[in-house]
Amino acid sequence: MKFEKLGQSGRARRGRLTLEHGVVETPVFMPVGTYGTVKGMLPRDIEDIQAQIILGNTFHLYLRPGLEVIKQHGGLHDFIKWNKPILTDSGGFQVFSLGAMRKIKEEGVTFRSPIDGSKVFLSPEISMEIQHVLNSDIVMIFDECTPYPATHEEAQKSLQLSLRWAKRCKTHHHDELKNKNALFGIIQGGMYEDLRDESLNGLLEIGFDGYAIGGLSVGEPKEEMIKVLDYLPNKMPHDKPRYLMGVGKPEDIVEAVRRGVDMFDCVMPTRNARNGHYFVTDGLVRIRNSKYRHDQGPLDPHCDCYTCKNFTRAYLFHLEKCGEMLASMLGTIHNLRYYQRLTEGMRDALDNGTFDEFVQDFYARRGLEVPPCPVDE
């Protein structure tokens, strides 16, 4: 993996990632393909919205269809017919979302499969082996996602376990498996700045190809999230990619880019599309509202996606009211293209030296003031 920083405005960065299966321009949004598919999308649809990289889920693919099936296809790329880069999460977040269904020990985590109730064991080494079979361009370490809320003691105990697991991930990935694909560390520590520092410094000692911010978008108030983003990205290595995991409101992505983050993923655009909530240049359209019944305009006149070029809001309203599958498909195409256009717009603005104007326009269209942002030291 190679990362180049091509430009900067304040703390916002313009970069380029070169991976085994292609080049990724940053800032970038990665559509989530949990089970080896982005819900409601054909592979050619994902190409059409100009996604550069997608995310796969180690936990779910390990349980179903299982490694043997994917191994027979030579990896996840051929299995799902996607020839561009793939990032896979380690399965840690999903395991720790199981609550009482899992038991954490130093060796790893034992849990009951949500599919059939069978007992499953997942460890740092097993996670690395799964992602090696998947042949992910970017592999994420296996860690414990610190819950919210957590006391200082709980968050510290959790991050220290994650650091021990991080070292095991690095050893197995590089030394045992000889995997040449990128391995990213994940910074934990809850909402505590001293613990975030401890986690980051521990990961830097081990050494990774990129660094992710974990443990956000887990129920904390937005003010808490912004507080972490105010100080943490700027402490992360300036020559490595920075990835904010699972944070996905458009405003949150813009604010994170302003603070120096490069990579994003979230289920929000696909999940919201299935509920008739569509992101547009001026904010949000809730298409089930009766005011759209006779609306002859496109969903977003500024959008170049298949949905906006071909269909009216009235038609989308009709599909939603009828419960037609096509409503979710067209909405997903639009929402994911919106997210690609958002990050494209930020990349162009960073290239052209107009990033501040981009941010001002983004908020002005929503009738909002530009929030304060730390200036570069």
From Swiss-Prot:
Active site, UniProt feature: D89, D265
InterPro entries the record matches: ArchSynthase1/Queuine_TRR, TGT, TGT-like_sf, tRNA_ribo_trans-like
The keyword Transferase is annotated on this UniProt entry: yes
Entry's EC annotation: 2.4.2.29
GO MF annotations in UniProt: metal ion binding; tRNA-guanosine(34) queuine transglycosylase activity
One biological process term in Gene Ontology: tRNA wobble guanine modification
Pathway as given in its UniProt record: tRNA modification; tRNA-queuosine biosynthesis
Catalytic activity: 7-aminomethyl-7-carbaguanine + guanosine(34) in tRNA = 7-aminomethyl-7-carbaguanosine(34) in tRNA + guanine
Enzyme class: transferase
Keyword hit for Zinc: yes
Cofactor binding notes: Binds 1 zinc ion per subunit.
Alphabetical list of Pfam families matching this protein: TGT (PF01702)
Chain positions recorded as Zn(2+) binding sites: C303, C305, C308, H334
UniProt xrefs under Gene3D superfamilies: Queuine tRNA-ribosyltransferase-like (3.20.20.105)
Cofactor requirement: Zn(2+)
Function description: Catalyzes the base-exchange of a guanine (G) residue with the queuine precursor 7-aminomethyl-7-deazaguanine (PreQ1) at position 34 (anticodon wobble position) in tRNAs with GU(N) anticodons (tRNA-Asp, -Asn, -His and -Tyr). Catalysis occurs through a double-displacement mechanism. The nucleophile active site attacks the C1' of nucleotide 34 to detach the guanine base from the RNA, forming a covalent enzyme-RNA intermediate. The proton acceptor active site deprotonates the incoming PreQ1, allowing a nucleophilic attack on the C1' of the ribose to form the product.
Family per record: Belongs to the queuine tRNA-ribosyltransferase family.
Protein name, entry field: Queuine tRNA-ribosyltransferase
Record gene name: tgt
